[in-house]
């Protein structure tokens, strides 16, 4: 096993390339998504192995609703299957399941399963697995600002406007207690952030790989971690 002196506390991955992976094999796109979810299980075990505390994955974006209805229905079924059959395994490994994103457009039964999974695993403390479903970075910021407005945080006792601070917005994000991603990996050779963790990624390091998500394995993870270990994170400052 490779050992690292510096490990990201929060690793995030854009799970990209499932459809193209399936197409190259002459299979339906949903076969790629199914294989991608299987790989999520394998990668989660690696997260524990390498001592990464927070692991978030971009599973379904706010823009993914524009995909064909059959594909969306298939993805929702896969999410149900994952929660029904894999949550107990994650919990047994010390993992806490959490979700980020809006829930008003998701099927009611899926939302119920998500809430139950969060409740069942809330006392696990080895690592957090964060599934971003119906998540969009812009939407998250809008929701945070609207929460501040509806909560009266933008009005003082005299009725005058009170400026919003970074701390205010941070405290109203979907998961305000989760640290910002240290390293964001995007698979499949695309070079875009795609609306993922927009607020939280201001000083995240990025690692891009041509490998499709279903083929992402331990060797690829090690490459990303080695790259991260060699980064000089200055956060806008300079070395003395």
Predicted regions located by residue number:
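Flexible, compositionally biased loop and terminal segments
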Residues: 1-240
